[in-house]
From Swiss-Prot:
Family per similarity comment: Belongs to the RNA polymerase beta' chain family.
Gene: rpoC
Keywords: DNA-directed RNA polymerase, Magnesium, Metal-binding, Nucleotidyltransferase, Transcription, Transferase, Zinc
The organism of origin for this protein: Aromatoleum aromaticum (strain DSM 19018 / LMG 30748 / EbN1) (Azoarcus sp. (strain EbN1))
Cellular-component GO terms for this entry: DNA-directed RNA polymerase complex
Chain positions recorded as Mg(2+) binding sites: 462, 464, 466
Pfam family, any one: RNA_pol_Rpb1_2
Protein name in the entry: DNA-directed RNA polymerase subunit beta'
Length: 1409
């Protein structure tokens, strides 16, 4: 009996943990037969009367096993004792019926058929191996042509196609000297006779000799496929099926419905069709039927096998009775509903429930209210266990009964079971890791789950009918992880930006704001109190108002660095509300943090300060108390919304009238032809935009201030206590823009296509809209809803792609030892500090010692984490750049190292080994996606106003420094004219810290000197915003060349002034003959001797070429001096580009798509000159210092940023336009690329006020750069132009260099996130992402091996993920596979390594248990 049980146990528990990798390959016919338990010969399924499977049919019990456990089909052998007996009557083995899920069968095909995946999945693998086109192969396979398999002694070629007539003619001519076949036999013959080794040698030879790029590409592709066959030992002819495997019947079930009908899987229909045709073909072959009939049958067989494998891939899809295409094997695994995404990655789990959520303000932060009935159901097994342990029930059945009848003792046991047993709450959509958090359940009556108000922000939950799911962690380890890692009170910070996410919102903010506001001349003003208690009594007895400024003694607790506490009592002059609030301050925070009106931002800062100074525990308690206080006071305040609160500004009518007059004036100008219709529209939109702003300002001034009489009887203004104003001002709800619609004017509205309607809505909701205004309003409202729906889908898809590209990036070691990093500076744009240095380096590890600039001593050592204190120190020393380690420079091969990542933002300390930083980065970028806009902005009206700046002034006092590559010349008037393309001027403070930075355009006039002190508000430089000058750097006499009126230039006469100017015209508009083709007007300069002036240090003449549209301002023979303007280019030519904004822009950046009109970067460093123009293109030549010249053709309509004789650096912009990230990587390197992508992505998020830490974007960029292209293979196994994982190349190079051979040379390549996900080494991960068929086809041919490195692959094979606490499991598993046995103590030590903050009580339980 014992051995029997042991056997049974073995049968149910196969040791699935023994494998380390999964390989995929093609199965040979013998392999398929070896899997099979018998051949399916008949298309029958189940006998409709007896419901028993037909013999030799698709559900045959003899092949697949018994239908009932331990019972043969005819019923002769029943029960366990006959285990393993094969019944002699019906031939069925007596065993478990679940073998019907795993036993396969096969069908012997009468004629070989091609596997459609290898035929049709582009590029066709069959075509590649045979070097034939897909069209040709199809003609052979579907019996339209013969193919020569063995030419013998004839002049025919192997693989040549012959039509029917050709074939008959050749047979006449050569008899049977040659073999030509049709259908899959022909292709199989070709594949069998293919000598892979020989072909590879031939191809390598061809690759050496050929020069054409296209051929190299074609050959290397084919070479790759053939080498894959060679390495994997897979024979090419296995792509042709001779035996078809049959899926186990329980995976394609047939279920009898009532009424004699059956519900069946589509696969059964597809198999039936194959079997029918196969049997018919066998019979025809036996009968020696005419060739044409056999051929037709073979073609039909090929088609039916095609649709079984991948229906609809070729021709029309096979349909069932209801005209719906049948679901083939390929459809089973691909797409959202396929095996990968539906069953392997997203399983449904037991011990879970869902219900509506309601607010639970009485809960502590780590609690949630769980309905009793739900808890009873969820914790059933625990209750059964307890009932048995206590001896209240002897069997499970009895326990079940007790629970179902809900006996009183059950409730007591439930209380006990639930104590200290966390449950996990999840709200869909789970966009980041805070969408699932653990709570300790508190039993409540009713049927709704109660949720703590402060976690609503993280869940993005509200109580308008949202539902949440509850999950119960079962094992002790799971409970411990839930408690230490997921408990709501352990997740105070947001992993996206390291700021608190447990922040009060809505009513709480309103209550706290109301409590901390100050009022003039309110009850009890000026009173003095000995302590808060006394003040409270005065308040309760109505002698004192919350807003009164009083004098009161407050107790503060000071905490020293060593943790000693001392109380200190100080007298403060503050408001009553703030004094009451001071009672709940955590020890260690001074009262000054509270002594202001608390708006939402302030409260967030307050919680942040508490977390940094007082630690997690105090902060959680503090947040809870803040919440209670806020709710209480919001109730007390009784703030409501009343019609009277919406004050319409008094000046509104005047402002609107003035705007109407302006619009009339512009309409008059338009009718008299002074402005075009476009200009008129833009101006009108502009005027109304301004008017709306003025009305809004007047309204806010009126709402925000009110007149009151103070104690001394004077009238003073105070901040208003208007309900609506308070709601917006505190940040509780609403915004200035919404109040503006309520009480100002609604302003301009957009049509559905995004264009702005020029007649605004001048009324507001308070006054009411008329029919037309209401109708116009509906446009915008409806578009908003449509936009939101679109946005959600798009944002979700972006997140999915991001997660997929980064899912295997985990912190795998503590320090990779690199000294590399990026130099971080404050981000300054348009003279304003957008992001100070402290925000950019906080939580990073510095790569070099930070040195005090004055004393030159090291203040922070390289390799130390820059926390708040370190950053404060750096700021105080006036250091304006720090080199920090980044994810992009990390040298860890697989994964990242902790030092290069820095601080784990969600925990506030150095990141742990095992943290899945890739997924966190993806979530942090994807989660705010729904807040981004979807539309592209057309620059016009309002947006273009800002563009026409004509100068910069300093915003702060300091010292001027020139930055960038500032070059300037002084002209005759002594003005400094800038002749550099990327000049910048910086204003630094006394400490030398950069305060502002401004970009200056070419041709601007500098008004300050380098190193000069300036005050705030001083003009630094001016320029004409509407034209771009061309300035001469040399003096001399102007000599025109190719300046012919009517040929290259035209005379323009200004109607108003009557002056004439020469305008350079395009060759197409030229009037004279062909002589002037390709000639461009230019100016040369002559010196006193009449010789051409040379460029300094060379023997090239100075020649300034004018581009089309330039206005030449000098005359022939005129004397010019340095810095004079030769020509002006009107700036209308820079067309207003549509700016892609919001979500599409982020997707575009991460997909690394080259922009439409990309700018051109200089490929080399050298001097620019212009060659002869060809049709429609201008020729730009860059001559390097050693004299090598490189030509570039640039379309005429493009705006060239450089001029003749200018020196450009490699990677500098020479043709205007948005940058192409691939060019940046190639010419400027990784750092420049990272900067570009980070800045661009951050710009989009910053516009919406979303904060994301740079390191998340760096992590994504690292994954986009993880592949390289081989330039020169050296002695490695790679092929030139091949794309490989960087880590793979490095490993291979290490191996080769160790043998003293030549390593492979490679260059970085940037892949978009979709491409990067699909080209990952793990085929399982790629297949579960997108294009499943293609990925699997490719992997099968190459015999790929998946080492199960990433998170996704491990989820799919059903293991713990190799991140976090799962890392220990994987390490142990590997050790055990290597034969070491590790005890439980070891596992415990590992666990503590990964989960640092395990509470003591838990650890005792675990060690005891």
């Amino acid at each position: 009996m014992k051995s029997l049980l042991a056997d049974l146990f073995k049968q149910t528990l196969p040791n699935e943990d023994q494998f380390d990798a999964i390989t995929i390959g093609l199965a040979s016919p013998d392999k398929i037969r070896s899997w099979s338990y018998g051949e399916v010969k008949k298309p029958e399924t189940i006998n409709y009367r007896t419901f028993k499977p037909e013999r030799d049919g698709l559900f045959c019990a003899k092949i697949f096993g018994p239908v009932k456990d331990y019972e043969c089909l005819c019923g002769k052998y029943k029960r366990l004792k006959h285990r393993g007996v094969i019944c002699e009557k019906c031939g069925v083995e007596v065993t478990l019926s679940k073998v019907r899920r795993e036993r396969m069968a096969h069908i012997e095909l009468a004629s070989p058929t091609a596997h459609i995946w290898f035929l049709k999945s582009l590029p066709s693998r069959l075509g590649m191996v045979l070097d034939m086109t897909l069209r040709d192969i199809e003609r052979v396979l579907y019996f339209e042509a013969f193919v020569v398999v063995e030419p013998g002694m004839t002049p025919l070629n192997r693989g040549q196609l012959l039509t029917e007539d050709d074939y008959l003619a050749k047979v006449e001519e050569y008899g049977d000297d040659f073999d030509a076949l049709m259908g899959a036999e022909g292709i199989r013959g070709l594949l069998r006779t293919l000598d892979v080794k020989l072909e590879i040698e031939k191809l390598r030879g061809d690759l050496e000799t050929t020069g054409s790029e296209a051929k190299i590409k074609k050959f290397s592709k084919r070479l790759k496929v053939l080498e894959a066959f060679m390495q994997s030992g897979i024979k090419p002819e296995w792509m042709i099926l001779e035996v078809l495997p049959v899926l186990p019947p329980d995976l394609r079930p047939l279920v009898p419905l009532d009424g004699g009908r059956f519900a069946t899987s589509d696969l059964n229909d597809l198999y039936r069709r194959v079997i029918n045709r196969n049997n018919r073909l066998k019979r025809l072959l036996e009968l020696k039927a005419p060739e044409i009939i056999v051929r037709n049958e073979k073609r039909m067989l090929q088609e039916s096998v095609d649709s079984l494998l991948d229906n609809g891939r070729r021709g029309k899809a096979m349909t069932g009775a209801n005209k719906r295409p049948l679901k083939s094997l390929a459809d089973m695994i691909k797409g959202k509903g396929g095996r990968f995404r539906q069953n392997l990655l997203g399983k449904r789990v037991d011990y879970s429930g869902r219900s509506v959520i309601v607010v639970g303000p009485q809960l502590k932060l780590h609690q949630c209210g769980l309905p009793k009935l739900m808890a009873l159901e969820l914790f059933k097994p625990f209750i059964f266990n307890k009932l048995e342990l206590m001896g209240l029930a002897t069997t499970i059945k009895q326990a079940k009964k007790m629970v179902e009848s809900q006996e009183p003792v059950v409730w007591d046991i439930l209380e006990e079971v639930i104590r200290e047993h966390p449950v996990m709450l999840n709200r869909a959509p789970t966009l980041h890791r805070l969408g699932i958090q653990a709570f300790e359940p508190v039993l409540i009556e009713g049927k709704a789950i109660q949720l703590h108000p402060l976690v609503c922000v993280a869940f993005n939950a509200d109580f308008d009918g949202d539902q949440m799911a509850v999950h119960v962690p079962l094992s002790l380890e799971a409970q411990m992880e839930a408690r230490t890692l997921m408990l709501a009170s352990n997740n105070v910070l947001s992993p996206a930006n390291g700021e608190p996410i447990i922040v009060p919102s809505q009513d709480i903010v309103l209550g706290l704001y109301y409590a901390t506001r100050e009022g003039v001349n309110v009850a009890g003003e000026g009173m003095a109190f000995s302590d808060v208690g006394e003040l409270k009594r005065a308040y309760e007895s109505k002698q004192l108002s919350l807003h009164a400024r009083v004098s009161v003694r407050l107790k503060e607790v000071e905490v020293s660095a060593e943790g000693e506490r001392r109380d200190k009592i100080t007298r403060y002059n503050t408001t009553a509300g703030r004094a009451m609030l001071s009672e709940i301050l955590p020890p260690g925070l001074p009262f000054s943090v509270l002594d202001k009106a608390l708006k939402k931002k302030e409260i967030s800062r307050l919680i942040n300060a508490s977390f940094r100074r007082c630690g997690l525990k105090e902060t959680v308690v503090f947040a809870d108390k803040l919440m209670q206080f806020g709710f209480r006071l919001a109730t007390r305040a009784g703030i409501s919304i009343a019609v009277k609160d919406m004050l319409v500004p008094r000046q509104k009518d005047v402002l609107i009238h003035a705007a109407e007059q302006e619009v009339k004036e512009i309409a008059r100008q338009y009718t008299s032809g002074l402005v075009t219709d476009g200009e008129r529209y833009n101006k009108v939109v502009d005027i109304w935009g301004r008017a709306g702003d003025q009305v809004a300002k007047a309204m806010m001034d009126q709402l925000g201030q009110e007149d009151v009489v103070n104690r001394h009887g004077d009238t003073v203004k105070q901040e208003s206590f208007n309900s609506i104003y308070m709601m917006a001002d505190s940040g509780a709800r609403g915004s200035a823009a919404q109040i503006r619609q309520l009480a100002g004017m609604r302003g301009l509205m957009a049509k559905p296509d995004g264009s702005i309607i020029e007649t605004p809505i001048t009324t507001n909701f308070r006054e009411g809209l008329n029919v037309l205004q209401y109708f116009i309003s509906t446009h915008g409202a409806r578009k908003g809803l449509a936009d939101t729906a679109l946005k959600t889908a798009n944002s979700g898809y972006l997140t999915r792609r991001l997660v997929d590209v980064t899912q295997d990036l985990v912190v795998t070691e503590d320090d990779c030892g690199t000294r590399d990093g990026f130099v971080m500076k404050a981000l300054i744009e348009g003279g304003e500090v957008i992001e100070p240095l402290r925000d950019r380096i906080l939580g990073r590890v510095c790569a070099e010692d930070v040195v005090n600039p004055e004393s030159q001593e090291t203040v922070i050592e390289a390799g130390s984490l820059l926390g708040e204190d370190a950053v404060d120190l750096i700021e105080s020393l006036g250091i304006d750049e720090v080199k920090v380690r980044t994810a992009l420079t990390c040298e860890t091969r697989y994964g990242l190292c902790g030092k290069c990542y820095g601080r784990d933002l969600g925990r506030g300390s150095q990141v742990n080994v095992g943290e899945a930083v890739g997924v966190i980065a993806a979530q942090s970028i994807g989660e705010p996606g729904t807040q981004l806009t979807m539309r592209t902005f057309h620059v016009g009206g309002a947006a273009s106003r800002a563009a026409a700046a004509s100068g910069v002034e300093s915003k702060s006092a300091g010292t001027v420094r020139f930055a960038g590559n500032m070059r300037y010349v002084s002209n005759a008037k002594g003005e400094k004219i800038i002749i550099a393309r990327s000049a910048e001027v910086v204003v630094a403070d006394d400490m030398g810290r950069e305060r502002e930075r401004h970009k200056l355009p070419y041709g601007a006039t500098l008004l300050v000197d380098d190193g000069a002190p300036v005050k705030a508000g001083v003009l630094l430089a001016t320029w004409d915003p509407h034209t771009r000058p061309i300035v001469t750097e040399y003096s001399g006499t102007v000599k025109f060349e190719n300046v012919e009126e009517g040929a290259t230039v035209a005379k323009q006469i200004d109607e108003v002034t009557g002056l004439s100017t020469l305008v350079v015209i395009d060759g197409k508009r030229r009037t004279s003959g062909a002589s002037s083709k390709g000639v461009r007007p230019q100016v040369k300069l002559l010196d006193e001797r009449g010789e051409e002036v040379k460029i300094a240090g060379t023997d090239h003449s100075v020649a300034i070429t004018f581009q089309v549209g330039s206005l030449i301002t000098v005359k022939d023979g005129q004397e010019v001096s340095v810095g004079d303007i030769l020509a002006r280019i009107p700036q209308e030519s820079a067309k207003t580009r549509d700016i892609t904004g919001g979500l599409p822009r982020v997707a575009e950046l991460f997909e690394a798509r080259p922009p439409k009109d990309a700018g051109v970067l200089a490929e080399y460093t050298g001097t620019v000159s212009f060659g002869k123009d060809t049709k429609g293109k201008q020729r730009l030549v860059i001559t390097e210092a050693d004299g090598t010249a490189h030509e570039f053709l640039i379309p005429k309509d493009k705006h060239v940023m450089v001029h003749d004789g200018q020196v450009v650096n490699k990677g500098e912009l020479i043709v205007d336009g948005p940058a192409d990230p691939h060019d940046i990587l190639r010419l400027q390197g990784i750092e420049a690329l990272a900067r570009y992508i980070i800045d661009e992505v951050q710009d989009v998020y910053r516009l919406q006020g979303v904060k994301i830490n740079d390191k998340h974007i760096e992590v994504i960029v690292r994954q986009m750069l993880r592949r390289v292209v081989i330039n020169d293979a050296g002695n490695s196994r790679f092929i030139r132009e091949e794309q490989v994982e960087r880590s793979e190349v490095l490993d291979e190079n290490d191996r080769i260099e160790a043998e003293g051979k030549l390593p492979a040379q490679y260059q970085n390549v940037l892949l978009g996130i979709t491409k990067a996900s699909l080209s990952t080494d793990s085929f399982i991960s790629a297949a579960s992402f997108q294009e499943t068929t293609r990925v699997l086809t490719e992997a099968a041919i190459m015999g790929k091996r998946d080492d199960l490195r990433g998170l996704k692959e491990n989820v799919i094979v059903g293991r713990l993920i190799p991140a976090g606490t799962g890392m220990a499991y994987h390490r142990n598993r590997k050790a055990q596979n290597a034969g070491e046995d590790l005890g439980p103590e070891h596992a415990w030590a590992e666990m503590q390594e990964v989960v640092p903050e395990v509470p003591a009580d838990v650890s005792q339980d675990v060690q005891a248990g």
